[in-house]
Structures are given as C-alpha cells and as structure tokens.
C-alpha cells in the first residue's frame, strides 16, 4: 500500500510516518554522500535528506541530477527537527520524476539576485518563489477574513457591474470600452450600484476588480486592483468609522493567527501588527492640517500644506508614520471630495467623510463617507461638478423613494496586503500586476 498523500503545510500531523508529497524541486544542496533537496508544493517548503547508503543507487542518482523546478512525487518518512524552518524534515525513500527541467533550457529564476524588471517579465515564474508564494497566501487570507467579517455581521454580498455607462467620480481616469454603438467604461467603484442594493437589503458589500487609468508610477498605484465596498442603510459617519475599525482589526488579527509563518518568511515585523487593536486614533482634517504645517515648520515636509487641499502621498506618509495604529482623518473640505458626500450640518463646507491611513507610512487604505440623502442637494452637486444629469437619473431615484441616511467605504485589497506584509511596492501584492508600463505577462 502506498503512503498517504499530504501537503507540506499538514506534514506535522504525520510525524514518524511515511508520506507522499507532490510538488517541485525548489533548491538543492549536497555534502559528500548526503543530498539536501528542498521541495515545495504550494503550501510550503520542506527539506529532504537523502543519504547515499539509505536509498538505491538509482534513487540517489535521480535526486542528484534533479534540476530546479523539476516536478516530482516524493515518498519519505517525516522527522521532527527543531533546526528545520518548518520544524520537520523528510527522510526521502523514493522520488518519481514527473518532468525534468532540461539542463539546456534551465529555470530562469535562479537563487541569485535578479533585477525587478527581469522578475516582472518572468512574473509567471516569480510567483513560485518562497517570498511571493507567502505574500499570495496572506492575500488570500485577507480576502477570506474580509468576507467572513461581513458575512458574520449580516451583510449580503452583492455584485455591481464591471461595465458602466458613467463614472462614479468623473471620467478623467476611466478606461473607455466600445459597447456596441455606445460608450461604456470599466468600473472605478461599485459604490453607486451598491447604494441601490443597500436600499433593498439593508447591509451589503461587494468585492471585485476596479480600474483607474491614472498615469501614476508610485509604489502605491495599480491600474487594476481589487476592492471591498460595504454600504449600510441608516448609517452615519461614526457608524462607518466603527465598521472600518472593526474590519481592519479583524483582518490583521486573522493574519497574525493563521499566516504567522508566511509573514515571518516575508520578514515582516509581527510585533507591529500586534498593536492593531481598537480604538484607532481619529483626527479631523483641521487637526491634520495643523500637524502637517508643524511638520513643514520643522523641516520634515518640503511643501507647506494649505487648508483646502487634498492630502497627497507625502502628507499621508508623514501623518501615518506618527501612529502605531491606523489613523482616521475625517471631515475633509467638500470641494476636494466626490459629489455624493453628505455635507457636515455644523460646517457645510466640509464633507462627512473619512480616510483611514495605515501606520508605518503606508497611507490611505480606506476611503468612505456618509452619502447625500437629499434629492435637491444631490442634483445641485451633480450640476456643480459638470456631470451629465441624465446619466444619474437612476441614482437620483434613490433619493425620491424612501431616502435615508446611509454610507459606506472602499478598502483596496492590494494596499492592505502591502501594509500587512510590509512591502515596498504594491506590484508584489497581486499575481499579475497591471501598471502604467506593465501589461505583460
């Protein structure tokens, strides 16, 4: 009877037993009559041990001549070893080669250092590296945690369209698509549509791709990214801030609990993630402006920030670096925000909105607001922004038939992954990043 098939992630359940692994050769070391092949299977990496005197000559030679990324089925006995990265090694008894990578055309990504451009050209192979695989597993955990958070709190998943007839916030950064004899656009946000489903279902969220034709080359920008967007009927700004605080805390805790090994493999300082617990600091836009102006006076910021402007990346980085938790900046000037945001009744020049800035200088990961409930005021804002009123007729209907205070926010998955994993650039947060200068592979 053949040994049971298992995964490297589950190998600890089989200590002292013979098992079968199906995967690829990740790396190889040799020391005299001992071979130390490293195998990966998508769930992790384990070191095998092959003493020449413990296996047949054919098996020893087969392992010795394995090339990097050759696909293999390995049989061996699981042995606990505290020195091993995962706490276990595999005493190899037999190896079946499924496909041997040809020596004449070797795997291009070797253990040596490679430039970013080379790695991006070979992204379809780069994702196999230990670091990239760990990042993608953390990404999957974040997405699962987000869904669990909303599902457990009575939210209904709803799916807004990818092809839209109009922009959520203007057309300057939209990707146009020919839609038969009409002009359509790839969605920038599902928000307007999930406002409609929130009026039907109460508490909803969407999760899907969004597209921004921004000609930005910063470490924070992708042209295609994934966003989760909750929307809640009968919600005001404080409710939304509480919800965002709960979501972030839940997601980070889940990653600490379930993806600690992957975070360690990436080199993340997990002690910084241990601090992500409610309550989060909340500061007004006015307080943020004062803070930024003091930073400029001290020489920490090149440009003096003036009241009325939107926060740029250097401003977000400066502010968020002062806190060891996400900081919530609320009530921005309405003129720098989207047309649909509810004005502050105390100061109508401000919008009831919030941006959540991740610590360690990572900047905005969530942006949200209370939505405008008044039909007349929304019509006025659409006109002020020079938007086509006819295109928003259906959206205005929501204010005619049982309008209520409501709101929501969007959280970019890639920026959340970058922060939680401690990454320099968002290009590593998604399997195949789309950027200003990157459409391949």
Name every feature range the model reports, one short phrase each.
Residues 235-245, 289:
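Extended, domain-scale alpha-helical bundle/helix-rich regions
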Residues 134-138, 185, 236-240, 280, ...:
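Catalytic cores of large soluble enzymes that bind and process phosphate-bearing ligands
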Residues 160, 167-173, 247-361, 384-404:
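Metal-assisted phosphate- and nucleotidyl-transfer catalytic regions
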Residues 3-233, 418:
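Class II aminoacyl-tRNA synthetase-like tRNA-binding/catalytic domains
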Residues 99, 251-255, 424:
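Conserved NTP-handling cores and scaffolds of large molecular machines
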Residues 199-209, 218, 222-236, 256, ...:
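TRNA-recognition modules of translation machinery and tRNA-sensing kinases, especially anticodon-binding
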